Amino acid sequence: MDTLIRIKRCALANRLRLTNKARDELEIDDLDITDIRESLMNAVAIYKTIRSTNPQSHRREYLHIIQSHNFSGITIYTKGKLLVEEGIDTFYLLVSSKRAL
């Protein structure tokens, strides 16, 4: 299944989680989780996928960067990863969420 569709399904089902960094960025930019959900639902493509190594587990992971606008027209930058448990997309963890420059 397409990764963007999997991310959109997590957003639609309100299965989004934020790191402290992402939460702080939202607060600084005066955004909330609804803005992020709207932005993810409006996305037409994943801008970039980055291969990374988790510092805690030392396992490879993929971070997806998406830039899209919310329903108010604000362009939002998000970076996150799909977390899968037992073959099921559990939720989308947002590592970074802020207004795009």
Provide a role label for each language-model segment.
Residues 1-101:
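Ribonuclease/tRNase effector modules and their secretory precursors
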